[in-house]
């Protein structure tokens, strides 16, 4: 039986001094859990010490794609006319929360079209949870949506859902498809009942706010890119936005004009400058102010890309007079924003706008984030460093702000937060100033990663009341993707569970008070067929780890 030790050190704060070069942490546990597969193929560690008290870990499966729960089928996709499509196996975020004082799961599906479900739960006094009814959120107001990835709650009780994998509007064809069918964008025709001419790439790739008593709404002011997660800070005004671009993404910070109202504000993108050792210093480049209304008005006209930008092909590292070279996920381009469209351009093409503003657009697979508010640290998962973040692998004129050694296993970084310093930059106590690697995977032979270290980190969650960062994996470089607990004070890494074979670990969210207990939400996307029930194919699933004592 694997024993996992979890400690409490409430006085710890993130160090302000530059760190030493990264050293792999001590690891607790064997390379693979020896426990047999449990519910839905999950392998769970045995006992843990939780804040000094022995605790037997418990995983509670709650929902599976295709389950009929009450009157609806969990994960059923529909077209805009209500025609039933397939059941989506791309279950991603599935977070436990309270709605009107009652527990529920809010779940995202990474499909085309995407879907969001809300599942009511019953809670027993001993911490047992059970799904009682599910309902699909009507996404008509946001044209269905595309690839709903991670999510986060707001202090106002709403929910921010992130759409990733935005298509390149430069490649839109007259029939509504995009020429390279990026991430199968053209499959969105299913939402439009086969008529993709009614759609535009700029309708997808946004943060969507879900409320109890209002239709879902795009937050156009937050910008369009491959949103992994929009994470609000405690001031309910500052929101960090991670970009799940394959090789040319940015890190964004949005500041709303008014707390809790994300319909207007200033969007910033980070410039990373190499400092001492492994540290990078962060400065913030403004992409300007915008409102939902002014961006939505431009998109409603369904403009061509060239109606908003002047475009030319670079000659090496040179552009025609008046145009500027921008290196992003889409490669090197010469661009200039049309006069009068600056606000809209900065949002419909936020990554390109970030490059034009001098921000760093070299991050690869910037994934989940988690906030340690007491330690003034924001944690960010970078799933790998193999192209954009590695020196010399991009074309002429690329700046190479990031100078990382290639590492296909990726890492988790710690961003130290403090008061905004630049007069023209973001303000308040939640502005990131430095970034340093906290924990990195260790490459092994044959495109693998060492089993006693993390590999391809994705979802993160900070466990309040401890010094523990939960880390979920999404890759193919371990025998099975794992959920880890990392004690940031002791520097100890512990494997807590392994996903079903072939599945990624996703949907992490710490919920501290449900019926007197605390839980860690966790989901498993696209398991291998051998973990299906007797009815047939593999089924994504979600549940909770816990209860943990409060």
Give short role names for the model-derived ranges.
Residues 1-4:
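Sec-dependent signal peptide recognition
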Residues 17-550:
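Conserved small-residue
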Residues 12-13:
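Bacterial signal peptide processing site
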